[in-house]
Curated annotation (Swiss-Prot):
Transcriptional activator that mediates FGF signaling during neural development. Plays a role in the regulation of cell movement. Does not bind DNA by itself. This is Protein Churchill. The gene is churc1. Zn(2+) 1 binds at C2, C5, C30, H66. It comes from Danio rerio (Zebrafish). Gene3D superfamilies: Transcription activator, Churchill. GO terms for molecular function: zinc ion binding.
Length: 112
């Protein structure tokens, strides 16, 4: 993918995992046509296999269709937790885990 189009490669996004969209704060402009315009999403695929959902797509320049980055988002349920991951040169890297139970056992305080 194109390192000249992004301010920072794979910025740490904490637990912000995007299934769609673009992180435009990290987009400095197209290295090919030198325009800073909207970023298109192209070739979006969604695959469901063995309790895992994988979404991939390309970020492309609106003006010249230059490929800026490849975006990958995954969702899976492991034990009692929904696990999310994102990896993209433009949008960054992130992971999140959310309990499917009403009260997250990791958030409860010990009684003693």
């Amino acid at each position: 993918m194109c390192t000249g189009c992004v301010q920072k490669q794979y910025p740490d996004r904490g637990n912000t995992c995007l299934e769609n969209g673009s992180y435009l704060m990290n987009f400095v402009g197209c290295a090919n046509c030198h325009q800073r315009d909207f970023v298109l999403i192209s070739d979006r695929t969604m695959v469901n296999e063995d309790e895992e959902e994988i979404v991939t797509y390309l970020h492309m320049c609106k003006n010249c269709e230059h490929v800026i980055a490849r975006h990958e988002y995954t969702f899976t349920v492991v034990d009692d937790y929904q696990e999310y991951t994102m990896l993209c040169m433009l949008c960054g890297k992130a992971e999140d885990s959310i309990s499917v139970l009403p009260d997250d056992p990791r958030q409860t305080a010990p009684l003693f």
